[in-house]
Amino acid sequence: MVSSVSRRFLARAAVLTLVSASAWSVPASAAPPVTGPLAANPFLGPLGTATMHGDAGSSDVTPLAGPAAGAGVTVYPLGAACPTLLEGADGLVVGLCTAIAGQTPTVFLFDTAAPGPVGGALASLPLTKGSLLGGVYAFLDNEDRLVVVDGARRLLRVAHVRGDDGAWRLTATVQSDLSGVIPQGDNVTGLVPDWSGNVWFATGHGVVGFVGRDGGVGTVRLPSGESVANSISSAPNGGVAVASTHALYELRAKNSEPEILWRAAYDRGAARKPGQLSWGTGSTPTYFGPVRGDEYLAIVDNADDQVRLIVARSGSGEQVCSIPVPVGGSENSPIAIGSSIFVASTYGYPYPTVPEGAGPAVPANAPFHGGLSRVDLTADGCVPVWDSRVRSAAVPRLSLADGGIHTLRRVGPDSATPLDGFDYVVVDPETGAVRTSTHLPGTVAEDPLQMAALITRGGALWQGTVTGIVRIG
């Protein structure tokens, strides 16, 4: 949910009506530096900017540097929530947003160099409407085309071209009609290519499959009652990870059909937690590891008393560790690279709406205290490193270039009010301390709703909000 579902939500939330903290439990000395490999999928656009979570493995890590201190702010008032913002090799930003009026998914094209305090789109293209979370997740392929499944259950590739008149246009080509394998009323919530070029998808009602490069389609259905509310991930080893509302799966393509390699149930708790969008994990599963970048998978469960970070071995599903994290609950995909994992709390986050069928939250609401935790995977298992009180209001993004975790922080009382504001902050991954903080204009009309940010090659951070985009830098 991107995740997210992308997570990351929401277009999730667009759908709706408008309506300083420091680190604690910090070790005496800084933790080891965070580093590790990022696997570049040959069928995706640039590493770090082609998917909601940065790459096919959903690391939420980028090789690019974020904004410098004191960078200017540009607001894009689009009348739409923008959970998916991606940058292609041509340096243009493509957004997949959901219009507040009519809840129509819309593709936008933006110029990253546009000056001024208020920005706009170069072109837009409405898509067929589906569910609240259907179409939230998309990716840019290696030709800078947006790959998405629309509400009519068609796999589209949306290209942007500049005409002789200088105007930009968005054009959609149907790659595959999936209405024969995805039932009416069901929608795709996760989408990713594997290393062979198959485009994998997962639906809210538990259909998992892929469209092959030859156009063939293969599917498998998860057990009755299991749904998929977050996006999916792929790895160089051929694996594709899916987290349902009950279990973590790893699959692969075999003889033109998806094969389930293993299934590992997790503690989904007694009900949906406040600040989450489904009853179960809020994680898009994250591939990571110190050698290839795909040795392990990480998710956060939904246990009642205290949620746990779960790390499983890719390929076998063997549980490597399970450790409590003091975040209450998380709707965000973990950041993970090398041997380090970061988990952000969304427990109590005031989403204005939740997907149909999400079920009641227990309790119905709760204060949003926030929190960000680092856990390292060692020879002895998972070891807690630090916990921070940062009230992250977006999916945090770790930059390997500048060594900071970039996010937006909600400012106001823990109970959350319409007068709350937001800061752009950079957190030190070695200590959990806030390095820099910049106050942003606006209040809940610019709520990032736990959506993922994009860091561009030009060093700007683009953050989707409930009404459009805030660009820093």
Please describe what each predicted stretch is.
Residues 2-127, 135-136, 142-145, 468, ...:
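Sequence/structural signature of beta-propeller modules
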Residues 93-96, 145-149, 198-202, 239-242, ...:
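Conserved beta-propeller blade signature
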Residues 447-473:
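Blade-level signature of beta-propeller repeat domains, shared across WD40, Kelch, NHL, RCC1
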Residues 77-87, 126-142, 178-192, 225-236, ...:
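Repeated scaffold domains used in trafficking and secretory/extracellular systems
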Residues 100-111, 152-163, 205-212, 246-252, ...:
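Structural motif
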Residues 97, 295-299, 332-443:
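Loop/turn-rich, solvent-exposed surfaces of beta-rich toroidal or solenoidal domains
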Residues 122-134, 152-153, 159-196, 203-205, ...:
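Asp-box/WD-like beta-propeller blade repeats and closely related beta-sheet repeat scaffolds
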Residues 68, 121-130, 169-184, 260-278, ...:
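Surface-exposed loop and turn segments in beta-propeller and other repeat-based domains
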